[in-house]
Amino acid sequence: MSETARTTIDQSEVDRFSAMAAEWWDPTGKFRPLHKFNPVRLTYIRDRVSEHFGRDAKSRQPLEGLRVLDIGCGGGLLSEPMARMGADVVGADASEKNIGIARTHAAGSGVSVDYRAVTAEALAEAGESFDVVLNMEVVEHVADVEFFMTTCAHMVRPGGLMFVATINRTLKAAALAIFAAENVLRWLPRGTHQYDKLVRPDELERPLEASGMEIADRTGVFFNPLANQWNLSRDMDVNYMIVAKRPI
């Protein structure tokens, strides 16, 4: 298959999330786990970006002046907080329904986000570039992980960062993130994740490094049921995040 024919889109995944689009901003609905997950990933992104670009993470708008791409933005759960922190945000998603929900919510919240129903490859082909690219809980839903990572890496400006968050392909992840989360605890609709589409860290890092990126940080993330919150961890066997930087 030629590279021009490659696509990152898995239409069945787009359809699955389009069908749930109306629930994006319901903290007790089908996206409840993402609402729970948002604080730890927002803090991690803010702190890493602030450290990298020499910003004060505790200031009101530490991302002011930075252009940020939230790829696979869904209803905007990350895009809106990024914009509130001062970033110039492009929220991109392959689902027109998701983008419609995101635009409506942003308008009602008074937050400015440039939402687009567009693919990563279309943005890259248009020559778009960003200081920060966010791939959060997306790679396990795309059709071609290597192509997706390469495409997104090309949009990171020199001196810029990419964040990736996903679920590891391990038996532990299958037990906790799929069986328990979807079938026992019912945190997610059944079928949200498929084991063979989960991605190991090395499968992300190889195409990033081949695209000239350098791995800057890695962290696991785990859910503490006693505190009812997500925390960073050294254990990357289930949920994890990777930060890559493009040298100047």
Swiss-Prot record:
Keywords from the UniProt entry: Methyltransferase, S-adenosyl-L-methionine, Transferase, Ubiquinone biosynthesis
EC code: 2.1.1.222, 2.1.1.64
Domain of life the protein comes from: Bacteria
Major enzyme class: transferase
Catalysis: reaction(s): a 3-demethylubiquinol + S-adenosyl-L-methionine = a ubiquinol + S-adenosyl-L-homocysteine + H(+); a 3-(all-trans-polyprenyl)benzene-1,2-diol + S-adenosyl-L-methionine = a 2-methoxy-6-(all-trans-polyprenyl)phenol + S-adenosyl-L-homocysteine + H(+)
Pfam families per the UniProt record, alphabetical: Methyltransf_23
InterPro entries, A to Z: SAM-dependent_MTases_sf, UbiG_MeTrfase
GO molecular function: 2-polyprenyl-6-hydroxyphenol methylase activity; 3-demethylubiquinol 3-O-methyltransferase activity; polyprenyldihydroxybenzoate methyltransferase activity
GO biological process: methylation
Binding residues for S-adenosyl-L-methionine: 41, 72, 93, 136
Pathway info: Cofactor biosynthesis; ubiquinone biosynthesis
Function: O-methyltransferase that catalyzes the 2 O-methylation steps in the ubiquinone biosynthetic pathway.
Stated family: Belongs to the methyltransferase superfamily. UbiG/COQ3 family.
Protein name: Ubiquinone biosynthesis O-methyltransferase
Gene symbol of the encoding locus: ubiG
